[in-house]
From Swiss-Prot:
Region called Necessary for the association with the MRN complex, residue ranges: 223-259
Basic and acidic residues composition bias: residue spans: 221-230
Positions of modified residues (Phosphoserine): 115
Protein name: MRN complex-interacting protein
Pfam families in alphabetical order: MRNIP
Amino acid sequence: MAPPQQARVLRCCCCSLFQAHQVKKSLKWTCKACGKKQSFLQAYGEGSGADCRRHVQKLNLLQGQISEMSLRSLGESISANEEENVGPWQAARASPQETLQPSKNRWLKYLERDSKELGLKGGGVCFNSQPSSETEKPDPPFSTGLPRKRKWNQSTVQPLCGPHVQDSRNCEVTLKSLKARPLHPTWGARSSPDCSTWDLPCISEELPPSFTQDRAGLAGKGRESSREDLDTMELVPRGEPPCPAQQVRTMSKWEQCLGNSSHLDTEPLTPLQRGLRPIQAAQAEQGAPRAQTPREGGLCRLPGARQSPQTTHTPMPGPKWLCGRIPEQSQGTGPWAEGVPLVKGMQARSSLMRLCDLFKTGEDFDDDL
């Protein structure tokens, strides 16, 4: 039988792996792992192929373990060196942090405990005890300051109220003096509900005696005709003196002779000033009684001195400025100055009252009667 071929164990110079190759005459061989060609330098074992392969496995395992151990040792040495180099710096940095952290935690613990105690006790009795003592100490100055504040309030109120009190006293004195004295005619007209009763004694002091006698005669009739007086009060404005009321009362003096003349004089004023009734209805009401006045009274003429107030107050001041024909007709048709009969005078008055209408100026209304 032929002898088995011998093999040798070789190691690559590049990858440092153990391999089994057959023995040859040439000294060159190629690595099975990396494929590099190299020459024979050293044989790590010789034998059969099977024995060489087992030996190669053992060598590779040992080499791997050694390489791992070397790597571990290198890593450990590097880590040890790093720890030796960085250790003191890290220890110096870590020591203050470790010292600060427990201090912070300790303070937080105390604060948390205090907050819990405050929440349970409702504001903390121990904390409130100190400010309570502090507030109790300044109590006496506050107590002494209270009367000072009251005195100051009184001092401030007294000078303010002083002039008012004096004014009120003066007002009381003036009221008492005014009660003793007769009232002014304007005051009496504003304060009295009936102008006819309260104005007479006030005006009697200022007017001549002849006029006061006539007014005294009309005072009793003014009480009887309360409705007519109320109508005249409505005609008089509140802020002005009662001049129109006086004129109406002077007109009411002729009631002794004409009977219903006051009713005739007061009626034509109400529709003109109030504007409630139409002018035609007023004309119809004026025409009937004024046509009867000459039959009932039987008067022909009246003196111009007594009828002068009628002409002054019957036409309103507004229509005079607006109606241009009123003053001309009042001057031309004035029956009391020329001596025309009473019927013509009443017709002229009705024509004057109709021409005062702003919307019907320039027309002749004599044919309607």
